[in-house]
Amino acid sequence: MSPEIALNRISPMLSPFISSVVRNGKVGLDATNCLRITDLKSGCTSLTPGPNCDRFKLHIPYAGESLKWDIIFNAQYPELPPDFIFGEDAEFLPDPSALHNLASWNPSDPECLLLVVKELVQQYHQFQCSRLRESSRLMFEYQTLLEEPQYGENMEIYAGKKNNWTGEFSARFLLKLPVDFSNIPTYLLKDVNEDPGEDVALLSVSFEDTEATQVYPKLYLSPRIEHALGGSSALHIPAFPGGGCLIDYVPQVCHLLTNKVQYVIQGYHKRREYIAAFLSHFGTGVVEYDAEGFTKLTLLLMWKDFCFLVHIDLPLFFPRDQPTLTFQSVYHFTNSGQLYSQAQKNYPYSPRWDGNEMAKRAKAYFKTFVPQFQEAAFANGKL
């Protein structure tokens, strides 16, 4: 159900509270998921004119789970705070004295419900952390992370239900990784969606038993960061080592991700240097180039009255990954009506060369390769 449809069914006096929750409500580490409501119902009599829904189920993203809490207002007394039912978490009994925004409920503040939900989620986190005491191993993992502020202050924990047969229970740690994304080139962060939210990397680590014999890590990147780093398949985190600890494993993943970000930033500056060198060496032979991301360059060149194009595609992780050179005849066509072309990646190249050296080496390579390309174009293409 879309937020607008849901809000149209809410009692008008309660609508500001719920609007603040579904339109602006982001609670916890997962900035890509908003709060949402379902199961709208009314406690009013059938004679009460609508819209009159005053109770609903609130879905809250937390540690990879979706908490489902019932929130019950009374449309007849909209100035009163709501009641809460915590669904499957019957053992969760929040401390009323710590719910300051509930105790001092201000019906004139549209955000008062959202503020109470945030306080409840904080207490829910403490409740989940306390459940780890049943496992010395999981408690060790938690306490060692807690000693590091960069991890301890950005962590959510969900302890699963006990297995009735074994007495074991699972646990999931969700951590917001302290990786700086601020220097990623802006062109890579565009056009993902209209409201991308915070740029964030979350590491989820699931312990399927209390002795950590089955541990499954997974990395989640916000949409813009995933796009900037080359897509979901571009980054593979290592398996959790047997006998390993989170306090050792999490920094490894941070280091891996930081290096990936640095590769992207370095690639952008190196591509710009590369294209600047080609502009200098080939001058009027440059037909066009990508002036934003510096990922493409096209040259129009001549060798003994034979004109040809060279399309240069620079990869995201340049200079580590070698550019592709595509030679294209301006005279000859394939059977499908396309200009005859050949792509080359087997040419002299070193990622250690600067842009000027790469341009000089490319110019020398063009002179050696063009004769055989011309011969192939005449042999395989059609005028």
From Swiss-Prot:
Domain of life: Eukaryota
GO CC term, one of those recorded: nucleus
Modified residues (N-acetylmethionine): M1
Biological process, per Gene Ontology: apoptotic process; cell division; chromatin organization; double-strand break repair; mitotic G2 DNA damage checkpoint signaling; positive regulation of DNA repair; response to ionizing radiation
InterPro entries per record: BRE
Residue numbers spanned by region UEV-like 1: 30-147
UniProt keyword list: Acetylation, Apoptosis, Cell cycle, Cell division, Chromatin regulator, Cytoplasm, DNA damage, DNA repair, Mitosis, Nucleus, Phosphoprotein, Repeat, Ubl conjugation pathway
Parts of the chain that traverse the membrane: none
Stated name of the protein: BRISC and BRCA1-A complex member 2
Source species: Mesocricetus auratus (Golden hamster)
This protein's encoding gene: Babam2
